């Protein structure tokens, strides 16, 4: 990974050049920000796509952090998933799509750009699958071709998934046949073997994601398709993890969003009590990642302010305060803003590049032992891939051992988190603590009766390992309904959980082919019944 100031300075200049005029309605009309093959430098353009990729993925993750209880949701689902929530993300995606098509056009005439275009197609494919997973049908083939399609129509998620799968296969071939590298590859430093491992793992993710509707995307035997992938290179070690690494640069702003939220100014959010409880108290041993994930700013009692002053006596509040100065809020708690910003628990060392918790009890902006925001965006790690393989082994009988994969998935997560930032502290977790944690999980796994109960354990551990990438949890929750003990909003026992996100209100206003959708609409691979999750 590269974190150089020179790169971010270059990105700033590119961004100014590309985005100097107001960005608007990328899927709909001619836009002076769009580059054409005649005006584009492929190196700079692929740099820009990498920047757009991490920015858009980071924003999408923020959109589901509170939905999935990592942060506390202090609104209703309807307020949280409103028609304006994806305005910025929608525009960013279609700018990236236009840049992607420009690189593709350049590569058709220049064989030295095979590797460039392969990276381009994989990054754009990942963004596209994310957009489909959040919204279902989106403009795709007709998008960013305003001369032919001034009001591009929707394309089904099924058709888009099929096209992305084809793009992955083509990208792998192009990587294998390419002879020229990309000079500023921010993910794998032009390591072609790692890009191929990512491409295969991305395909695995798609197959597991669609296991309830695999025939819709033309996969008649999903277990066979997955087994064929298992014979190929996959992400199976931390050195192959697909992640974006942030820097410590402030101008232009290049630090992790979690760090900017918790350490640059007073923390305006609350961590979710359910998530903190799961780390601290859901097993007989605390999660060894606890002090790496979370940082406590204060050792003061919370009971002098609302809601803590009353919520212990309120039957609808599940947690209120979990103790040991882990101060957060329950899911759906709307009583906020009582001046305790510097007493709340905030993001810690991993993944946002904050502070490791050594009982300092100092407000986050005043700490000096943090990583200055040089965190990571964990997108598809060896841990995630092994959780997906464990699910496939259990539910699709792929032939692998789900217990073994569960152990390896948790171990990979522990190794990654506990080595992050090279902590040297009396409070750092030990190998013995990790072993005790994993042993308890596997004991529970082997002492439940049904595969559904085993899947609940796999997905719950996936949920805990996916801190920093709530998209994985959001998808798994809709696909499986797990974790089964996830907290329901305290003010509503029967809420309408957003099974998808609405379209950008701005896009619907301008594009006559779009009609606003409901957040109860299910994406094609979510075949579970209405009211399945809360």
Name each region found by the language model:
Residues 21-79, 83-84, 91-94, 102, ...:
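Membrane-proximal, proline-rich intrinsically disordered regions
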Residues 1-19:
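Sec-dependent bacterial lipoprotein signal peptides
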């Amino acid at each position: 990974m590269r974190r150089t100031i020179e790169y971010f300075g270059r990105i700033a200049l590119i961004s100014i050049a590309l985005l100097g005029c107001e960005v608007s309605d990328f899927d709909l009309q001619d836009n002076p920000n769009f580059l054409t093959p005649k005006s584009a430098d492929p190196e700079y353009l692929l740099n820009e796509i990498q920047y757009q990729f991490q920015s858009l993925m980071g924003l999408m993750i923020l959109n589901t952090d509170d939905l999935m209880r990592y942060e506390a949701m202090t609104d209703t689902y309807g307020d949280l998933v409103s028609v304006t929530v994806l305005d910025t993300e929608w525009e960013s995606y279609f700018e990236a799509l236009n840049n992607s098509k420009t690189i593709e056009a350049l590569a058709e005439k220049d064989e030295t750009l095979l590797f460039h275009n392969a990276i381009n197609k994989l990054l754009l494919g990942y963004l596209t699958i994310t957009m489909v997973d959040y919204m279902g049908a989106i403009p795709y083939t007709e998008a960013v071709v305003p001369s032919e399609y001034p009001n591009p129509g929707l394309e089904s998620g099924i058709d888009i998934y099929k096209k992305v799968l084809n793009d992955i296969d083509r990208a792998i071939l192009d990587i294998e046949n390419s002879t020229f590298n990309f000079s500023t590859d921010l993910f794998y430093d032009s390591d072609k073997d790692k890009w191929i491992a990512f491409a295969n793992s991305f395909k695995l993710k798609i197959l597991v994601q669609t296991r309830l509707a695999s025939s819709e995307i033309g996969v008649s035997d999903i277990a066979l398709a997955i087994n064929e992938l298992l014979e190929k290179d996959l992400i199976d070690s931390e050195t192959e993890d697909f992640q974006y690494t942030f820097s410590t640069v402030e101008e232009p702003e290049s630090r992790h969003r979690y760090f900017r939220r918790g350490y640059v100014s007073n923390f305006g959010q609350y961590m979710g009590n359910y998530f903190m409880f799961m780390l601290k108290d859901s097993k007989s041993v605390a999660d060894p990642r606890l002090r790496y994930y979370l940082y406590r700013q204060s050792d003061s009692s919370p009971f002098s302010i609302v809601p803590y002053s009353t919520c212990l006596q309120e039957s609808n509040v599940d947690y209120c305060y979990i103790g040991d100065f882990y101060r957060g809020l329950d899911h759906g708690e709307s009583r906020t803003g009582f001046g305790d910003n510097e007493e709340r628990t905030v993001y810690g060392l991993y993944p946002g590049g904050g502070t490791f918790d050594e009982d300092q009890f100092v407000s986050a902006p005043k700490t000096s032992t943090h990583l200055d925001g040089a965190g990571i965006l964990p997108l598809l790690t060896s841990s995630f891939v092994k959780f997906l393989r464990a699910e496939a082994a259990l539910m699709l009988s792929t032939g692998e051992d789900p217990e073994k994969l569960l152990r390896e998935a948790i171990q990979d997560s522990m190794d990654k988190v506990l080595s992050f930032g090279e902590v040297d502290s009396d409070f750092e977790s030990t190998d013995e603590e990790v072993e005790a944690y994993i042993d308890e999980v596997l004991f529970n796994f082997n002492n439940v009766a049904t595969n559904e109960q085993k899947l609940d354990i796999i997905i719950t551990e996936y949920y805990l390992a996916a801190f920093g990438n709530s998209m994985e949890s959001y998808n798994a929750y809709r696909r499986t309904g797990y974790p089964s003990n996830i907290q329901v909003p305290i003010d509503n026992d029967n809420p309408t959980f957003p099974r998808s996100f609405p379209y950008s209100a701005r896009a619907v206003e301008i594009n006559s082919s779009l009609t606003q959708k409901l957040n109860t609409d299910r994406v094609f691979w979510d075949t579970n019944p209405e009211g399945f999750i809360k």
